[in-house]
Amino acid sequence: MPVAGGRIPDRDIAAIREKVRIEDVVGDYVQLRRAGADSLKGLCPFHDEKTPSFHVRPNHGHFHCFGCGEGGDVYAFIQKIEHVSFVEAVELLADKVGYTVTYTGSSTTNVQRDRGSRSRLLAANAAAAEFYAEALQSEEAAPARQYLTERNFDAAAAAKFGCGYAPSGWDKLTKHLLRKGFEFKELEAAGLSREGKRGPMDRFHRRLLWPIRVSSGETIGFGARRLFDDDPNQAKYVNTPETVLYKKSQVLFGLDLAKRDIAKGHQAVVVEGYTDVMAMHLAGVTTAVASCGTAFGEQHLSMLRRLMMDDNFFRGELIYVFDGDDAGRAAAVKAFEGEQNLSGQSFVAVAADGMDPCDLRLRSGDGALRDLVARRTPLFEFVIRSALAEHDLDSAEGRVAALRRCVPMLARIKDPTLRDEYARQLAGWVGWDNVAQVIGRVREEAKGGGRKDNNRRGQETAARPKPPPVQRPDPTDPTLWPQREALKAGLQYPALAGPVFDTLTVESFTHPGYGAVRTAMEAAGGTSAGITGAQWIETVREQTTSPAAANLVNELSVETINVEDDEKLPRYISSVLARLQEVWVGRQIAEVKSKLQRMSPVEQGDEYHALFGDLVAMESYRRSLLEQASGDDLTA
């Protein structure tokens, strides 16, 4: 954990971990739902899935995905989701909870300079946003304020979205930030400044600015709008270049303001510009977002899917609001032709006269935008009808050409039921009497495309060597169920599992994976060591001898224990441990019986009778364990 001039002490790392609620941190990226006692679940942010397999255990400070295997504590989550180092993850979370990190081996004057690069870049962007917002009130910024006023955005709206102004001059922002203690290399890395012919210079000049924020509200870049005809940069909009913070394919403008309502209403509205997002929010459509400097893509879609998740199924709506021009129709077709993880719940809203949301609000008021969203059209229907509009359906030749154009488009729909339904509608729209013929052609086209896709996937799979399989127990194996539940109890509730768990031998766990976890728990001091929560899990992880065992610790530490409420946990855990003890004693009884069968009660009388007495005692003990294990709360 070393940094340039110092090391973060373990006490600070532990203190920050205790102050941070992992469910709050993860909740900035994933919509979480209750999944049992001390368990939350959602769609995994690290791989694409339709059924939630990502679990968070708040009281233990850990997460684990049963789909891709990712897991760990809150630091591991931030490292993975933000692509940062451990030091930067610690500093990011320290900033989040207002904790001042100290550094060993570092002088006081160098502490700030030694901070992880990500924290410094975030601080630079935050300072730049303040500078630009203040500059918007200057006399020079009158054209920028006029631009906003002409679009019916008042000062409150500008403040809500953080609007600012980049002043004229060579290096006003750069000098301001250098005076605040930042280095030029940091400003360059943040995309705020660049090296010019005459030295360091600002990236943006004489433009209206919007801060681009991540879902947690931190500024990571800016979008800038051209205001003056003599601006040498002819591009209407320019954005911060790709940086450590700003990845245009992974950010949506307005998401920090929209995420709560997107999750609550299971609906997201995708528009095409900064002013469109502002117009939508001010009109009451508070789920509006926009991509920044790039087209809306797969990673944007994945971000919204995770927010719109609801329990074990997906019921969200994604509404694209496009301009009515050719570019808007092309964008709709691109959305249709892309990955259809959401296509069945995707819609398109286009104003009758092709106006964008900002202009529509200016002309017709807030209600017009709400009506626009309410009158949305299913994406499939919009794309097909747009294609049909290019053909003369009053002629036989036009109808045939329309079918030839649209049948392959419908064949791309993955849902066979939905595909057949649109084939029926296509026949009606074209005026084709033989509906069955249209459905048949679409089905045939879909099968042909599927064979091509399968062949291509097979070739790709053959070309790539398969990674070695990870040896992990089958969580659904009923014969291993007591072992799995016992380990979950020992990891998640060591105080309740207590001394009884520690009496279980490693041999009680017949699967090598479970045995490895039990060995690590014993090496960590056992459940009676007095360590709980995230510290206990991390201590056990550190004692594992393989990545597979460490991953299994993560998995078991977050997997739900199916108990209705916490009051029933002690009884359940006691029953589970008794069941596992009973299985172990049963194996011992079998060995004793086998040994007795090989002995002669005449020739080995004393030894035989002593062993027989042990058998009677063991069977009595086994019966008591069976009674203890047969609690109402215990189900295999």
Swiss-Prot record:
**Cofactor binding, note field:** Binds 1 zinc ion per monomer. Binds two Mg(2+) per subunit.
Family from the record:
Belongs to the DnaG primase family.
Task: Summarize the protein's role.
Answer: RNA polymerase that catalyzes the synthesis of short RNA molecules used as primers for DNA polymerase during DNA replication.
Q: Where is the composition biased (Basic and acidic residues)?
A: 443-459
Q: Which GO terms describe its cellular component?
A: cytoplasm; DNA-directed RNA polymerase complex; primosome complex
Gene Ontology biological process terms in this record = DNA replication, synthesis of primer
Q: Could you tell me which InterPro entries the record lists for this protein? A: DNA_primase_core_N_sf, DNA_primase_DnaB-bd, DNA_primase_DnaG, DNA_primase_DnaG_DnaB-bd_dom, DNA_primase_Znf_CHC2, DnaG_bac, DNAG_N, DnaG_primase
Q: What is known of its domains?
A: Contains an N-terminal zinc-binding domain, a central core domain that contains the primase activity, and a C-terminal DnaB-binding domain.
Q: Which residues form the Toprim domain?
A: 266-352
Task: Name the UniProt key words of this record, in alphabetical order.
Answer: DNA replication, DNA-binding, DNA-directed RNA polymerase, Magnesium, Metal-binding, Nucleotidyltransferase, Primosome, Transcription, Transferase, Zinc, Zinc-finger
**EC category name:** transferase
Q: By its UniProt entry, which Gene3D superfamilies does this protein fall under?
A: 3.40.1360.10, DNA primase, catalytic core, N-terminal domain, DnaG, RNA polymerase domain, helical bundle, Zinc finger, CHC2-type domain
Where do the record's region annotations for Disordered lie? 443-481
**What is the name attached to this protein's record?**
DNA primase
SUPFAM superfamilies per the UniProt record, alphabetical: DNA primase core, Zinc beta-ribbon
